[in-house]
Amino acid sequence: ITYPPLDKEGIGVESPCNVHLVVCGMTDMGYAMALTAAHIAHYPNFLTAKKKSKITFVDADAHKKMAEFRSKYRALFDLSYVLYHEYTAGRETNRQEFLPSKDFLDIEWEFCQVPDFDDTYWEILAMEQEDNTNEYLTMAICYDSQKLCQNVAFYLPEIFYEKNIPIFYRNTILYAYEKELLTSDKFNNIYPFG
């Protein structure tokens, strides 16, 4: 399997685009994906257009896990812009912003607490993507439950498939029905890993 890069064909100095990685599941695999992206997702248009790469975590227990993650990587988060959202019953119920002590990093972080199987965040993200041509969105579905990873990957709002947004989902066993789905035109943007 050939996985597409976060920056598609590349981001140059004059590019108006930025990378946005959404990591579903604050698990060991999710942390590894996010930290790897934080190491490599640096682009020259930050110097000219102040475009930052964004890494978003989505998890049912994001508030607690965010505190643990930020504590573990305190030096990084002291210098990073962080936004926290909480979604309940179809709407945003809590929003907190954490400003960096110095604003010179080209990575920003977002943590979204969303109940499992609640479509609120996906619908908001889908609406943001409808007219957005300047954000290169990639999704990494990293829950510990393989079934939950499959459900999220294959049941997102249609725009994720129509716009061919790369969706990586954690999968240790590829079943025949998944192989069939992955070869269809609709799901050719979904990539199993793990």
In which residue ranges do the predicted regions lie?
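Cytosolic regulatory regions of ion transport systems
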Residues: I1-G194
